[in-house]
Amino acid sequence: MARVKRGVTKHQRHKKVLKLAKGFRGAKSKLYRPANEQVMKSLAYAYAHRRDKKGDFRKLWIARINAAARLNGLSYSRMMNGLKIAGVSVNRKMLADLAINDAAAFTELVNVAKAQVSAK
C-alpha cells in the first residue's frame, strides 16, 4: 500500500481555516492551531446567535410597542389583549414599525384596543 503524505490536502485545509480567521487578533489569524480553535468557536457562536436574534428582535419590538402604547395611556399587555379581542391580526414587527413611522395609525389601533378592553 502506498504511503500518503497529505502535503497538498493539509496545505489546502490550513489555507481554508486561515482565510476564515482573517481579521482575528494575533496568533489566531496567523497560526493554524489557534486559528482553527477560534474559527470553530466563532462558527458555534454564529450558529447560536442566529437563533438568539429572533428573540432579540421580538424583545425590541415589544419594548417599542410598550413605550408607544403607554404614551397613549395603555400598557402593552392590555393593548395586545384588546387587539386580539377586536380580531386585529397585526404582528409585533408591524406594530413596532407603525409606532415609529406612523404614530397616527398606531394611535388608532390603541383606540381600538382601548374600546375592546373597556367594553369587556
Swiss-Prot record:
Summary of the function given for this chain in its UniProt record: Binds directly to 23S ribosomal RNA and is necessary for the in vitro assembly process of the 50S ribosomal subunit. It is not involved in the protein synthesizing functions of that subunit.
UniProt KW Cytoplasm keyword: no
Taxonomy, superkingdom: Bacteria
GO biological process annotation, one example: ribosomal large subunit assembly
InterPro entries reported in the protein's UniProt record: Ribosomal_bL20, RIBOSOMAL_L20_CS, Ribosomal_protein_bL20_C
Source organism: Desulfitobacterium hafniense (strain Y51)
Similarity field: Belongs to the bacterial ribosomal protein bL20 family.
SUPFAM superfamilies: Ribosomal protein L20 (SSF74731)
One Gene Ontology cellular component annotation held by this UniProt entry: ribonucleoprotein complex
Signal peptide residue numbers: none
Record key words, sorted: Ribonucleoprotein, Ribosomal protein, RNA-binding, rRNA-binding
Listed CDD domains: Ribosomal_L20 (cd07026)
Gene Ontology MF, one: rRNA binding
Protein name in the entry: Large ribosomal subunit protein bL20
